[in-house]
From Swiss-Prot:
The lineage of its organism: Eukaryota, Metazoa, Chordata, Craniata, Vertebrata. This is Protamine-1. The gene is PBP1. One of its GO terms (molecular function) is DNA binding. Disulfide bonds: none annotated. It is found in: Nucleus; Chromosome. The keyword Metal-binding does not apply. The keyword DNA-binding applies. Residues 1-40 are annotated as: Disordered. Keywords: Chromosome, Developmental protein, Differentiation, DNA condensation, DNA-binding, Nucleosome core, Nucleus, Spermatogenesis. GO terms for cellular component: nucleosome; nucleus. Testis. It comes from the Eukaryota.
Length: 40
């Protein structure tokens, strides 16, 4: 059985810039920011 990777919890939090204004036209067909809540 391969060893489990440790999940880094604080690394995805530093993406706090305002990307939402610049990439808003890309995500109109596919709401990417909606899948933030993940169960583990």
């Amino acid at each position: 059985m391969p060893p489990r990777r440790k999940r880094v919890s604080s690394a995805p939090r530093r993406r706090r810039r305002t990307y939402r204004r610049t990439t808003a036209h890309k995500h109109q067909d596919r709401p990417v920011h909606r899948r933030r809540r993940r169960r583990h």
